[in-house]
Regions:
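A generic structural signal for residues located within well-ordered alpha-helices
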Residues: 1-2, 101
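Conserved acidic
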Residues: 2, 56, 171
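Short catalytic helix/loop segments, enriched in acidic residues and glycine
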Residues: 2-11
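Glycine-rich beta-alpha loop elements in corrinoid/cobalamin-binding modules
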Residues: 9, 19-144
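A structural motif corresponding to the C-terminal end of an alpha-helix
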Residues: 13-16
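Radical SAM [4Fe-4S] cluster-binding motif and immediate context
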Residues: 146-147, 151-176
Length: 176
């Protein structure tokens, strides 16, 4: 769900949608080799990491970077220990890790990827600078949640559902 929220947000902006296409979500635990073969030619691959997918995402990100050292590996979610000073010594294959909310940061990353690839002015990131950490400060919070379209209402999941008619899909509403 979280990656779909990120894409729902950035897909509102024409400068993003005319340059980028959303690939298929990593939602099953396919064999790492199969996932790497499918993703290694992408320019950017992002991981939204939680307790239930941390190990898999970590291995997949590491193997993707081995297969294509030029791929930009993004990470986010509550399961990366971003407070650790040696984060990129533990995860040298991750290029950028988003702290807290990632919607605005993700949009800026996509914009900078097309131009100067200098992400240091984007708030809310940890950037891997050859194993050293550049911390760009706190993320810009979203004041109005209505600025993020629901991925359930924007057809983001439609192609995934059409590709897998054998699966009975359901949606979950989660609140605080």
């Amino acid at each position: 769900y979280s990656p779909a929220v990120l894409w729902s947000y950035v897909a509102q902006f024409e400068n993003i949608t005319k340059e980028y296409e959303l690939g298929e979500f990593i939602w099953r635990r396919d064999l790492i080799e199969e996932a790497v073969a499918r993703l290694k030619d992408h320019a950017i691959v992002g991981f939204s990491t939680y307790i239930w997918n941390r190990s898999y995402n970590t291995v997949l990100a590491r193997e993707l970077k081995k297969a294509n050292p030029n791929i930009l590996i993004l990470a986010g979610g509550p399961e990366y220990p971003i407070e650790k000073p040696h984060f990129f010594k533990t995860y040298p294959f991750i290029d950028i890790c988003a702290k807290l909310e990632g919607e605005k940061s993700f949009k800026k990353i996509l914009e900078h990827f097309l131009t100067d690839k200098d992400y240091t002015s984007i708030p809310g990131l940890l950037i891997n600078d050859n194993g050293k950490t550049i911390d760009t400060g706190d993320a810009v919070r979203i004041d109005d949640l209505d600025t993020i379209p629901s991925p359930y209402l924007t057809d983001i999941f439609k192609s995934l559902m059409e590709k897998h008619p054998e699966i009975r899909w359901n949606a979950t509403l989660e609140t605080n």
